[in-house]
């Protein structure tokens, strides 16, 4: 019996399931009365849970713009100081239901989608707390490269209340930080 085809099939099935869940984690509430047009533009990544696709990157930003098909273009960019170069990835996002609810699915790789859920957002759309499909993905975003200690504590309190292990956050090096 050849084991390689079996391993490949199991791996492919795992990737489809792991990367296609666009729902928020159980018990986590996403933002309602969401206005996607106000969310568009550039956001600075203030903190994140560490993952291989962003490991070692500084000066990380995410820029969102409208797509012709009603979705949202996503451009993530970060500086890799070890390689002394910028890295960029482009993706697309779509609402999983009502666009006034901040639950989206995002893809950076073909047909594979993962959750992008805005779980906290200030009235001015200047600070956001975003999670993925489970509690292993969390980001604190801001329209500016730095945030106040007060805003940092607010975001940490919300993340803790929603069941995220905030001690796992890494704080991203940004200009002026």
From Swiss-Prot:
SUPFAM superfamilies: Lipocalins
Lipid-modified sites (S-diacylglycerol cysteine): 19
Domain of life per record: Bacteria
Lipidation (N-palmitoyl cysteine): 19
Main location: membrane
GO cellular component: cell outer membrane
N-terminal signal peptide: 1-18
GO molecular function terms attached to this record: lipid binding
Gene Ontology biological process: response to stress
Keywords of this entry: Cell outer membrane, Lipid-binding, Lipoprotein, Membrane, Palmitate, Signal
Subcellular compartments: Cell outer membrane
Membrane topology: Lipid-anchor
InterPro entries attached to this UniProt entry: Calycin, Lipocalin_ApoD, Lipocalin_bac, Lipocalin_Blc-like_dom, Lipocalin_CS, Lipocln_cytosolic_FA-bd_dom
Protein's job: Involved in the storage or transport of lipids necessary for membrane maintenance under stressful conditions. Displays a binding preference for lysophospholipids.
Subunit structure: Homodimer.
Similarity comment: family membership: Belongs to the calycin superfamily. Lipocalin family.
The name this protein goes by in its record: Outer membrane lipoprotein Blc
């Amino acid at each position: 019996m050849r084991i390689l085809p079996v391993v490949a099939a199991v791996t492919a099935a795992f990737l489809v399931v792991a990367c296609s869940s666009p729902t928020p984690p159980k018990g986590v509430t996403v933002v309602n009365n969401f206005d996607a047009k106000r969310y568009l533009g550039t956001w600075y990544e203030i903190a994140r849970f560490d993952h291989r696709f962003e490991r070692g990157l500084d000066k990380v930003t995410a820029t969102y713009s409208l797509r012709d098909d009603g979705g949202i273009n996503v451009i993530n960019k970060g500086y890799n100081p070890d390689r002394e170069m910028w890295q960029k990835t482009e993706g697309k996002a779509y609402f999983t239901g009502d666009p006034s609810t901040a639950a989206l699915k995002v893809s950076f790789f073909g047909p594979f989608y993962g959750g992008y859920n805005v779980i906290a957002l200030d009235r001015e759309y200047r600070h956001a707390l975003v999670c993925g499909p489970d509690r292993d993905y969390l980001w604190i975003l801001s329209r500016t490269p730095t945030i106040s200690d007060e805003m940092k504590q607010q975001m940490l309190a919300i993340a803790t209340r929603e069941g995220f292990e905030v001690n796992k956050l890494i704080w991203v090096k940004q200009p002026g930080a």
